[in-house]
Amino acid sequence: EVRVLDSLEEPVHRGGVKPAYLDERIDFRRGDVRDEATMLAALDGVDAVYHLAAFQDYLPEFSRFFSVNVTSTALIYELIVREKLPVRKVIVASSQAALGEGLYRDADGRAVLPGLRRDEDLKRGVWEIQPGPGQAGPLAYQPTDETVANPQNCYGMSKIAEERAALNLGRMYGIPSVAMRYSIVQGPRQS
């Protein structure tokens, strides 16, 4: 048995309409993952949670990134613990954006965690990350341990916070929890 809670918001869901491809046997509920009563009803009788809800955009709605992506995750754990729900596992959808650009080494072998790419470089068509002050170029990308996180936008910051909330709350309360770092999940049926 599968239950889905979704707000059906634009632009992911054009017209706010439930996708026609959903199997009719799915227990579909429309609602906001940040609403306690809605979330509690959605969790009733559930033994595994796949928390895929996320706000992603480049608009300066900074607080919305955290309320949807982090607060809703914390709410799931809060309800599981407070209501003693029989949830056996929680899986949250994170993102490659939680890592930022990853780890580089400069020409002198020093580790570099770069910040945002410079607008002036991008306007000139320079896509490679450039050395910063005190760094010898060129920079060479290094395989990056997943514990190295340096997110560069609100979405990435909220996803690393979501990961930490899920993994730490899961550990604290004995709820097996996993954060999956997806990469560019877009296109038809992305939701």
Label the predicted regions:
Residues 188-191:
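Substrate-binding strand-loop-helix patch
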Residues 1-183:
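N-terminal Rossmann-like NAD(P)+-binding domain of SDR-like oxidoreductases, especially those catalyzing
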